Every structure is written in C-alpha cells, then in structure tokens.
C-alpha cells in the first residue's frame, strides 16, 4: 500500500525572510540599547530598592532659604542677610553656592571671597542661621571659576592613590574637568571626609548636591557608556547616583544630627524619570534650573510646577524650586499691560511693624551711597532680569511647597526691586514660615509611611492638595483670572473665607497680585506659628502661642508633631465635634494656644474644662475670648489649662 504523499512545507517568500531577519536584528539592537544604556542609566524597572520611605526632614529646612549666584562673597552674603532682616523677611538658611572653594572639590574656603571663613560661618550659626554649602562628587584637574584654575596636582594625588572611580577617568562638566570620587573605596572616603570636615567642623548643616553624578561613565573603545569600574567592581550611573546621595547624607548625619542634603528629584522628566535621588536620602529636593519666565517650553514656572508634581507622584515629600527661576531673562510679554498697570499703581497694604522701614526705598529719594532703584524691574545687570509678576507668583506658589528656595541669578535684594514685590513676597514668606507646624506634621506622617506633603490631582491643570486640608491651583501665566476645579466636599477661599463652596465644582474668579488660588477644606484643623501681622492672623504677640485655625464641620481632628521637639516626636491632638454646640478637645502635650474659629455668629458662652471664660473687647489677655464680626472669627487665647476641653454654645 502506497503512503500518502506528505504535504510539502510552504516555503516562505524572500520578503518575509528579510522582514523576519530585520525584526530579529531590531530586537537584538533594542536589547543591547536597553542593557548597555537604559538599564545602567535609569535602573528601570529594577529600582524598587530606591523607593523606600523618605527620611525625617528637620523643621529648620522647611523654613525660608536664601541664596544668590552672581557675586558669591562674604560681603554680599552679609548685605543680603542684613537687608532681609532690616525689611523683616524670615530667613532661616543661607545657601553658599559655587564658587567658594580654592578648587573643585577641596572644601577649602577661598579667603579672597571669605576673608575670615571660620569666624564668619560660626558667627552666622550663632545668629541662628543654618548654613548649607554647594558641592559635587568631582575631583578636578581644571576648574573654570575657582581661585586655582589648574589643579592637576590635586587630581593626580587622588588618582594615584586609587581614590577615583575608573582609574581616574575624567569628564568635562560645566565647572571644568575632573574624575569621580569612588564612594566604594574606604580609603577614598576617609580622605574625602577629611576634606569635608574643614567646613563640617564649623557646624555646616547640609550640602547642595549638584548634578555631576549623572555624568558618571566610562568607555568601551571610543564608545561612552553609563558604567565604569569602582573599588568593589563595576558600577552603573544609576548606582553611582544612589551612592552619591546616600553617602553624603549619612556621613553628614554623623557630624550633625540635623544634617540634610539638597538634591534633585526630577529635572525634566526625560533625563531621569525614576528621579535623581533615592527616596531614603531625599531630605530636601528641588527640580533644577528653571528660567525667569512662565511657559513650560521655556523651562519657566510651568516646567517647575510640572516637575514638582511629578516628583510628588514618585513619593518625594519636601520639594521646591528657585523662587522666580534660576536664570535667564523674562520675556517681553511676561508682564502684560493689565499687570503692568497694577504694579505701577500699587499702594502699600502693609500693617505697621516695629523696627521695619515704613517706606520702600524706591518711593523715596535714593539714600546716600546706594544704587538708584528701579520701580519697574530689578536692578540685576546683564541678562538675568526678572519680571516683577514672575517673582510674585513664584513666591506665592513656593509658599505651598515644602521647600521655599529664594535665590539664583538676578536681583535678589527685594528692597531694590518694586514695592509690590517687597510687600507680597514678604507676606507669603511669612505665611510659609507660619505653616511649618502644619507642614512638619505631614512630613512626619510621610516619613512614617503616609502620603507626601503635595498630592497631585487628576482634575484641574496643576491642581494639588497641600497636606490634607489645602487645595492649591497655581497661577502659571500672566492672568488674574483662574478656573479652579474643586474636589468633592465643602471648601472656603483661604484669603476670604466667608463663603462655603460646594464641590465638585468649577469656580472661575480673579486673584489679585497679593492673593493666590488656595482653598481650605471645611472641617480643617490647621496648626500655625503666627509671628507677624502680614497674614492677618495675629501679630508679634502671637509668637508665644500655637495658633489653630478651625473650620468646624462634623467631626475632625489633627495631630500636631511639635517642630521644636525634633527629633523627639512629641504631639498634640485636637479633636473637633460640631453640632448645636462646638466641642474642642486637646490631648497629649500641653502648649499655650490661640484658637481662630470660623463662626457665623457670636457665641453665648465659652467654657474650658467646665469653667466659663470671660468675653473681652479683644482677646489680648489669656483665658478670654472675643468675636471678630467683620471676619466672622471667634478668637480664644489660653496659656494654662487642665484637660483642654472647650465647649462653645450659641443658645
């Protein structure tokens, strides 16, 4: 019996075979690109070890920072700090940016720029300032702007001893040319830390880690690749970046228990979409070098807001940007005719404050020996010119970020800028400072595994929650009008809180130059440390108390972690229960406090621990209450109490 013929296999056509070969080659090429470039540079997706909990940022780092990048001398730092103090701006931290050393990075202060560095910086510490120094991971053979521009001996010493990764492999970067310190070499670290101790011994509080770590690389033949040999073996760019942040942070903590590093989170999301710093070293983060303008495509404030919110989605907690941007010149159309008219017609709105100059120098005859003042733009020379409304709106946005970083290129002496800039930036600088108890409490919660301080929302361009109780919709263009998408719930406009707005809803309204689109949740309990009258919630006398803003609705509570006891986490919990009467309960740590309670009507009685409190014309004395009918606020001031249980009645 004959076998049936086996069907012949259909022979593939030559176009198919060519396409298949091309497909295989493409897959191989993609795999090579991924394993040789993408994986060692980004670490994606094998980087879960970088996504741990954020460290506990100390409260001082949440207060206002100041710096400049045009002069960089002791005399100019003094002028900045003395001027900000004279005009009553809150400044806790001064950032010393490059160049400050003899060469990059020997950590030796250039005494031409800082004639008596130890005396100067110890003196700043004695005045209550925190001091942070700029640095990178580079050991340079050539430096562009330091006192010693040729430093081959410095580089060769490190290379010959094996202190540099890749046997001293050098790259060009924006400050010169050098090699990478080897964070895996114990002897290299001993030498490196010895250099750093020159300033750490004076009480330095942190490093600004600039972004040379992302340049870590080597060569395969003539091909530049994102990996190189270190003391312990091969190291990728991504691994080097993690060592850079972690080592500098951890060693700093051995010298100062409140040490921080200022390090990038995102800086244009396509450069490192996984984030520059590992989360577990990200005490304070910023988003790189933005320009003094509005638009995203120009790397203006829209770019900063976008990068900050994307950083928050990655889990970074304390994030910010250079107020007004880092560099560049504002575009001619950044200040339109309507805004220019508002700036030109600005009338002072500041309350009288003791020991603060009553008049901006731009409105008076120029003081002897001082530079004439511009009433339109700042007096920065060259191309780093900042439009006034850019400075104002950026400062307002930064108020509702964890990191308020006022500095960069351009005129930063606000008393030499316009009157509205001086008054509005001062007002919002104080508002940010007064919100530190609220921010710090959320930072503690994030450190313990909770959500970040800033929480981007899906609805509304650039909308985010700032902690549990504030909705922020930043102004990102030269317009007074903004449409805000309110989430579900009830909300009040923070700068005029009379009206309750029901969400979800879209609200369109004008926001004057000295206000910002911020809404507070009905039911919010907000701790603040009021120290000045600029924000309208107290004055200098309030500094002895913790001020609590209460917007009663149903049951709500807030746990305050006291900044002044850091790193010990002492807390006070305030519970609010509203109905026919209002009950407020304090528990745990006792502290003098002022309650500012939204109330449509004046109460008939106020008691604490079953004891009736007297009404006063104004709550200037302890153990009394007053009612501000204009603002519909009940104000209670208490220094001592037994249990801290209030009962407020309207019958």
Predicted regions and their residues:
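N-terminal Sec-pathway targeting helices
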Residues: 10-29
């Amino acid at each position: 019996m004959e076998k049936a013929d086996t069907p012949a296999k259909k022979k593939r056509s030559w176009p198919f075979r060519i396409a298949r070969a091309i497909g295989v080659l493409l897959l191989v090429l993609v795999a090579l690109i991924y394993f040789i470039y993408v994986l060692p540079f980004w670490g994606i997706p094998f980087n879960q070890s970088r996504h741990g909990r954020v460290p506990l940022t100390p409260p001082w780092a949440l207060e206002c920072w100041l710096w400049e990048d045009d002069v960089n001398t002791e005399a100019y730092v003094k002028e900045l700090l003395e001027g900000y103090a004279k005009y009553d701006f809150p400044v806790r931290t001064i950032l010393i940016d490059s160049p400050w050393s003899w060469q990059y990075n020997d950590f030796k202060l250039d005494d031409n720029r800082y004639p008596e560095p130890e005396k100067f910086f110890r003196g700043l510490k004695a005045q209550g300032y925190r001091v942070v120094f700029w640095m990178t991971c580079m050991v340079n053979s050539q430096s562009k702007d330091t006192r010693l521009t040729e430093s081959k001996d410095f580089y060769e010493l490190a290379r010959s001893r094996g202190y540099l990764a890749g046997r001293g492999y050098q790259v060009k970067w924006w400050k010169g040319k050098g090699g990478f310190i080897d964070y895996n070499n114990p002897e290299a670290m001993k030498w490196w830390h010895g250099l750093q101790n020159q300033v750490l011994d004076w009480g330095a509080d942190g490093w600004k880690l600039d972004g040379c770590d992302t340049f870590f690389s080597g060569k395969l033949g003539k091909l530049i690749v994102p990996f190189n040999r270190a003391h312990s073996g091969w190291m990728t760019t991504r691994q080097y970046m993690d060592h850079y942040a972690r080592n500098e942070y951890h060693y700093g903590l051995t010298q100062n228990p409140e040490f921080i590093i200022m390090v990038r989170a995102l800086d244009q999301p396509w450069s490192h979409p996984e984030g520059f710093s590992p989360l577990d070293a990200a005490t304070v983060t910023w988003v790189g070098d933005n320009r003094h303008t509005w638009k995203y495509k120009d790397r203006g404030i829209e770019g900063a807001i976008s990068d900050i919110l994307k950083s928050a989605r990655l889990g970074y907690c304390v994030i910010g940007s250079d107020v007004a941007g880092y560099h560049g010149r504002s575009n001619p159309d950044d200040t339109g005719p309507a805004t220019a008219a508002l700036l030109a017609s600005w009338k002072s709105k500041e309350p009288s404050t003791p020991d603060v100059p009553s008049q901006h120098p731009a409105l008076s005859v120029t003081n002897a020996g001082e530079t004439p003042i511009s009433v339109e733009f700042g007096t920065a020379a060259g191309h780093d010119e900042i439009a006034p409304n850019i400075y104002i709106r950026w400062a307002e946005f930064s108020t509702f970020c964890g990191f308020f970083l006022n500095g960069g290129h351009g005129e930063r002496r606000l008393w030499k800028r316009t009157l509205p800039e001086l008054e509005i930036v001062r007002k919002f600088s104080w508002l940010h400072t007064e919100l530190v108890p609220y921010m710090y409490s959320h930072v503690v919660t994030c450190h313990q595994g909770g959500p970040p301080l800033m929480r981007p929302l899906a609805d509304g361009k650039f909308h985010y929650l700032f902690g549990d109780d504030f909705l922020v919709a930043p102004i990102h263009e030269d317009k007074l009008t903004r449409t805000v998408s309110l989430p579900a719930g009830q909300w009040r406009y923070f700068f005029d809180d009379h009206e309750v707005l029901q969400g979800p809803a879209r609200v369109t309204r004008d926001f004057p130059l000295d206000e910002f689109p911020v809404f507070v949740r009905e039911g919010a309990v907000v701790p603040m440390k009021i120290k000045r009258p600029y924000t309208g919630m107290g004055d200098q006398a309030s500094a002895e108390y913790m001020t609590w803003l209460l917007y009663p609705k149903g049951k709500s509570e807030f746990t305050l972690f006291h900044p002044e006891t850091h790193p010990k986490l002492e807390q006070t919990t305030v519970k609010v229960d509203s109905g026919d009467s209002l009950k407020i309960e304090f528990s745990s740590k006792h502290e003098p406090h002022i309650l500012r309670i939204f109330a449509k009507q004046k109460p008939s009685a106020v008691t604490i621990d079953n004891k009736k409190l007297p009404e006063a014309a104004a709550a200037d004395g302890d153990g009394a209450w007053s009612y501000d009918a204009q603002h519909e606020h009940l104000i209670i001031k208490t220094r001592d109490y037994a249990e801290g249980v209030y009962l407020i009645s309207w019958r």
